[in-house]
Amino acid sequence: MTPNRRSTDSYNMLGASFDFDPDFSLLSNKTHKNKNPKPPVKLLPYRHGSNTTSSDSDSYIFNSGSGSSDAETPAPVAPIFISLEDVLLNGQLIDFAIDPSGVKFLEANYPLDSEDQIRKAVFEKFTESTTLFVGLCHSRNGNFIVQKLVELATPAEQRELLRQMIDGGLLAMCKDKFACRVVQLALQKFDHSNVFQLIQELSTFDLAAMCTDQISIHVIQRVVKQLPVDMWTFFVHFLSSGDSLMAVCQDKYGCRLVQQVIDRLAENPKLPCFKFRIQLLHSLMTCIVRNCYRLSSNEFANYVIQYVIKSSGIMEMYRDTIIDKCLLRNLLSMSQDKYASHVIEGAFLFAPPALLHEMMEEIFSGYVKDVESNRDALDILLFHQYGNYVVQQMISICTAALIGKEERELPPAILLLYSGWYEKMKQRVLQHASRLERFSSGKKIIDSVMRHGVPTAAAVNAQAAPSLMELTAQFDAMFPSFLAR
């Protein structure tokens, strides 16, 4: 009898007779046609004389269930221990592999010694047919024993497993929620040459489709996180194309992947490979800057732009480029967009002083007033459903600077700028207070400019221009040797 035969047959293992139904479930409570069905025999882990499941149990017993509500209790059956060799000799390896309890038994008892004959026989059985191997990879339970094979495989066994994956349809495995685990583990455990061959095969697939699939994207993420950058340069080149970048960034899964690629390319500038990585990063960021306006207005792609703006280190130069080349001169229109307004908020928060000054001045005086309504940009944003959040961010930035909550200490001259911006917004808010009070957002804006503890412009101006006595004291502190003469 072939070991993977799908039929209702009676098996005998070490004196215990039990049935297998067509779904291969060792725990099946199959209903028999006869009136007095024989209770099915179940495979249970045996530990310290009890039938409790344990991850470290390596002994299994056959035990019969009650199966009947009769008052008469059947005589207890003595436990019968089995081994991996017993399963192999009785041709039930596949049945165990696709059963939830059986596969745990196989995992627990798979030999660690690569020269073990039982291990070799088990490996050969699972890889004798590509159809069988792929079926196990796609199986809810079978994928666990395949992962065990991958984890402990020798280089020769790795090559065989790799051949099976490629011949059996690697792309389909990547898109399957169970088989993709096998591919991910192979990327992590295989040696360099076999991983390189696996990557070469992945590079031939439709990468845009993989990056926007909620299952196969995990394979690409594993590549980006685990492998050296020089093994997936093809993926950076793929993203550096405008159409490819837009397709991936506009997807709710793909946008996060692009952020991970940026993070990996920009990490640890002290490593020798950073020069190579910075070239790839520049290629990708050039494409992102070129498409910044479209990305900022997309539901998911805007997160990529926000991520760049909020990043530090080497990414600050790209943050400044995005603000200068993409956001400036477009602040009013982007602030009124549902998604781009988040980008503008982040830009105000993380912009360096020079660019922040340009952004503030653009909102205050960079646009011609509307002829019909006589409203300027600040008036428009105050009452806009998205733009009001940008104004709130502007007020918050000025308030934080004036009350000393900035991380860095600002010189008096810079504080004067913040004070001037704050006073302009405060006066405009108070001018429109009666209308703003009708909206919850307007009430928040009014509250933000009426906060106590924010110094007035006069106070800041006085701080910026120290008195003669203060200048003398500062001089004395700087040059104490002069006084000692």
Swiss-Prot record:
Protein name: Pumilio domain-containing protein 7
Pfam families in UniProt: PUF
Role this protein plays: RNA-binding protein that binds to the consensus sequence 5'-CUCUGUAUCUUGU-3' in mRNA 3'-UTRs and modulates mRNA expression and stability. Functions redundantly with puf-5 and puf-6 in oocyte formation and organization, early embryonic cell divisions, and repression of expression of glp-1 and other maternal mRNAs in late oogenesis.
Phenotype of null mutants: Simultaneous knockdown of puf-6 and puf-7 results in ectopic primordial germ cells (PGCs) outside the somatic gonads, premature PGC proliferation in L1 larvae and germ cell death. Does not affect germline development in adult hermaphrodites. Disruption with puf-5 and puf-6 results in abnormally small oocytes, disorganization of oocyte nuclei and cells, inefficient yolk uptake by oocytes, embryonic arrest with impaired eggshell formation and cytokinesis defects, impaired repression of glp-1 in late oogenesis, and mislocalization of rme-2 to the cytoplasm instead of the plasma membrane.
Segments annotated as Pumilio repeats: 86-124, 128-163, 164-200, 201-236, 237-279, 287-324, 326-361, 370-411
InterPro entries: ARM-like (IPR011989), ARM-type_fold (IPR016024), PUM-HD (IPR033133), Pumilio_RNA-bd_rpt (IPR001313)
Alphabetical GO biological process terms: cell division; germ cell development; oogenesis; post-transcriptional regulation of gene expression; regulation of translation
GO MF term list: mRNA 3'-UTR binding; RNA binding
Gene it is expressed from: puf-7
Domain of life: Eukaryota
SUPFAM superfamilies: ARM repeat (SSF48371)
Region named RNA-binding: 439-454
Coiled coil ranges: none
Compositional bias of kind Polar residues: 49-71
Keywords: Cell cycle, Cell division, Developmental protein, Differentiation, Oogenesis, Repeat, RNA-binding, Translation regulation
Cross-referenced SMART domains: Pumilio
PROSITE patterns xrefs: PUM, PUM_HD
GO cellular component: cytoplasm; nucleus
PANTHER family: PUMILIO DOMAIN-CONTAINING PROTEIN 5-RELATED, RNA BINDING PROTEIN PUMILIO-RELATED
Miscellaneous comment as given in the Swiss-Prot or TrEMBL entry: Puf-6 and puf-7 are >98% identical on both nucleotide and protein sequence level. Experimental approaches often do not distinguish between the two genes, which are collectively referred to as puf6/7 and are considered to be functionally redundant.
Disordered as annotated region, ranges: 29-72
